[in-house]
Amino acid sequence: MSFKKILGVALVSALALTACKEEKKAESTAAPAAQAPAKIKVGVMSGPEHTVAERAAQIAKEKYGLEVEFVLFNDYALPNTAVSKGDLDANAFQHKPYLDKDSQSKGLNNLVIVGNTFVYPLAGYSKKVKNVSELAEGAVIAVPNDPSNLARALILLEKQGLIKLKDNTNLFSTSVDIIENPKNLKIKEVDTSIAAKALDDVDLAVVNNTYAGQVGLNTQDHGVFVESKDSPYVNIIVARQDNKDAANVQNFIKSYQTEEVYQEAQKHFKDGVVKGW
């Protein structure tokens, strides 16, 4: 091969190598700009709990660059299924006894607890009495009908001296487990989401903070009696086995478990919340 041909081949190779390097450099420079910001989709209940969670979203954005999208629910039927199927990355609305029962009944075997939020105490509310001693013979008391919150409400009624249960440590007690009922109270099981709205039709209703807050009630100003702060029913953040350690999930937890979010919860629930972390 002549010297000119060798020189030509070398020149073409050098130009190709330079072009390749420039292309890779351009790709390397452009890559960060093409990356989408970190995101997470979380299911929460509408009302005050959503407002509290929005404060966590602000912190997540400021500290971790995490965009939080909330999907709002009005009842407890769908959020766990949505996480299990991958429609949501996580949810924050329930306590462990509810998760256990819901997962068992629906066959949701991929859900895991990744963090705690708050204890939201149950309380008894009434438009007719200000003290349980004023409840008349045969008074009607509305309680949530989902298994975990039904037992929780019955245990709370027992602590007020209104009934006695066969086993007050059973977190899934039902009305048939009432062994003493001195005032012959009528225990009316209603959908958890409408318990607060039943106050016009019953003498007293046991309601959780989620739904009490939706109708403007809080434990401090309106509760006839309130669940004690040592309640084991701490609310939780739930994700899946396959994403529980993901950065977006972990950063959302860290954003929620902050003093700022606690203060926001105190503001909306009037001291009716207890830190769960």
Curated annotation (Swiss-Prot):
The keyword Signal applies. Keywords: Cell outer membrane, Lipoprotein, Membrane, Palmitate, Signal. PROSITE patterns: PROKAR_LIPOPROTEIN. Residues 1-19 form the signal peptide. It is found in: Cell outer membrane. A lipid is attached at C20 (N-palmitoyl cysteine). GO terms for cellular component: cell outer membrane. Gene3D superfamilies: Periplasmic binding protein-like II. InterPro entries: Lipoprotein_NlpA. A lipid is attached at C20 (S-diacylglycerol cysteine). It is a lipid-anchor. Belongs to the NlpA lipoprotein family. This is Outer membrane lipoprotein 1. The lineage of its organism: Bacteria, Pseudomonadati, Pseudomonadota, Gammaproteobacteria, Pasteurellales. The gene is plpA.
